[in-house]
UniProtKB/Swiss-Prot annotation:
<dbReference type="Pfam" id="PF00107">
    <property type="entry name" value="ADH_zinc_N"/>
</dbReference>
<feature type="active site" description="Charge relay system">
    <location>
        <position position="40"/>
    </location>
</feature>
<keyword id="KW-0479">Metal-binding</keyword>
<dbReference type="InterPro" id="IPR020843">
    <property type="entry name" value="PKS_ER"/>
</dbReference>
<comment type="subunit">
    <text>Homotetramer.</text>
</comment>
<comment type="pathway">
    <text>Amino-acid degradation; L-threonine degradation via oxydo-reductase pathway; glycine from L-threonine: step 1/2.</text>
</comment>
<feature type="binding site">
    <location>
        <position position="96"/>
    </location>
    <ligand>
        <name>Zn(2+) 2</name>
    </ligand>
</feature>
<keyword id="KW-0520">NAD</keyword>
<feature type="binding site">
    <location>
        <begin position="286"/>
        <end position="287"/>
    </location>
    <ligand>
        <name>NAD(+)</name>
    </ligand>
</feature>
<dbReference type="InterPro" id="IPR011032">
    <property type="entry name" value="GroES-like_sf"/>
</dbReference>
<keyword id="KW-0963">Cytoplasm</keyword>
<dbReference type="InterPro" id="IPR002328">
    <property type="entry name" value="ADH_Zn_CS"/>
</dbReference>
<dbReference type="InterPro" id="IPR013149">
    <property type="entry name" value="ADH-like_C"/>
</dbReference>
<comment type="function">
    <text>Catalyzes the NAD(+)-dependent oxidation of L-threonine to 2-amino-3-ketobutyrate.</text>
</comment>
<comment type="similarity">
    <text>Belongs to the zinc-containing alcohol dehydrogenase family.</text>
</comment>
<feature type="binding site">
    <location>
        <position position="195"/>
    </location>
    <ligand>
        <name>NAD(+)</name>
    </ligand>
</feature>
<dbReference type="GO" id="GO:0008270">
    <property type="term" value="F:zinc ion binding"/>
</dbReference>
Length: 341
């Protein structure tokens, strides 16, 4: 089958002819329709330090997808041939304390699709049936293919009460932008997003951000004053992994504020802990999606009118995958979709 693989320990992704995966007793075989390129895939393409320490070579990559069930393991129940599915990319062990307590998103033995095991950038993918999520008929393939990063946005944004609150989002990547849309949809008052990428700040405006602030040109404190904010932000969503952005968030949070952190710093990050202590801040780390509450929330949000389609800015056939990766690496894109049909 046709697949995109990290074939060599160097910069790049390669089209290969890979063997069709075998279906286990508890698995589904999915014929891939569309995939989306994730920031993780860009890290793997670039072969940065994280990738060198994490990714076995060769490896079929990719974990954002939608497809159709074409074969079902003999012990699987609840799925039929032809079901349209996406799936949770974190394969969990089922036997650790958190898995047995129903907190599978906190499994300490997680294996990642397209990271630790063969991925979705292929004509066919095998995953455990437990990880598959049926896509409602009124949700398009395009939207279903980005449910994985949308889930990161939903998990982060819905960590705390948002109704009537003022929200600061640091980092206008696709996940941060989708989080801004979620916050506005569920009733936040002001949603301010910061970055230095003008293209993505404009996307954030289209997705409903109250203000999209280029911190290289504008002071966050001035924006707060313009909005009539006198006490700071109630909720912070840190999506950038940039220390300066997190420091700015700590400076502008209200006392008793709550922060959800999804962005991963490049290394050790020192902060002024006295601000956390004296402001009484709550900080929550976010990894992946809650299984499967986040997935149900995603579908329900879209069905209730949330429009995240503007975040999809580029479409390519998989044969033109290089153009898709070039678009993602440029930073001048939202989500990039590859069609496998």
């Amino acid at each position: 089958m046709k697949a995109l693989s990290k074939l060599k320990p160097e910069e790049g992704i390669w089209m290969v002819d890979a063997p069709k995966p075998e279906v286990g007793h508890n698995d589904l075989l999915i014929k891939i329709r569309k995939t989306a390129i994730c920031g993780t895939d860009v890290h793997i393409y670039n072969w940065d330090e994280w990738s060198q320490n994490t990714i076995p070579v060769p490896m079929v990559v990719g974990h954002e997808y939608v497809g159709e069930v074409v074969e079902i393991g003999q012990e699987v129940r609840g799925f039929q041939i032809g079901d349209r599915v996406s799936g949770e990319g974190h394969i969990t062990c089922g036997h650790c304390r958190n898995c047995r307590a129903g907190r599978t998103h906190l499994c300490r033995n997680t294996s990642g699709v397209g990271v630790n095991r063969e991925g979705a950038f292929a004509e066919y993918l095998v995953i455990p049936a437990f990880n598959a999520f049926k896509i409602p008929d009124d949700i398009s393939d395009d939207l279903a293919s980005i449910f994985d990063p949308f889930g990161n946005a939903v998990h982060t944004a819905l960590s705390f009460d948002l109704v009537g609150e003022d929200v600061l989002i640091t980092g206008a990547g696709p996940i941060g932008i989708m989080a801004a849309a979620v916050c506005r949809h569920v009733g936040a008052r002001h949603v301010v997003i910061t970055d230095v990428n003008e293209y993505r700040l404009e996307l954030a405006k289209k997705m409903g951000a109250t203000r999209a602030v280029n911190v290289a040109k504008e002071k966050l404190e001035d924006v707060m004053q313009d909005l009539g904010m006198t006490e700071g932000f109630d909720v912070g969503l840190e999506m950038s992994g940039v220390p300066a952005a997190f420091h700015s968030m700590l400076d502008t949070m209200n006392h008793g504020g709550k922060i959800a952190m999804l962005g991963i710093p490049g290394g050790d990050m020192a902060i002024d802990w006295s601000k956390v202590i004296f402001k009484g801040l709550i900080i929550k780390g976010i990894y992946g999606r809650e299984m499967f509450e986040t997935w149900y929330k995603m579908a329900s949000l879209i069905q209730s009118g949330l429009d995240i389609s503007p975040i999809i800015t580029h479409h390519y056939n998989v044969d033109d995958f290089q153009a898709g990766f070039d678009a993602m690496r440029s930073g001048q894109s939202g989500k990039v979709i590859l069609s496998w049909d």
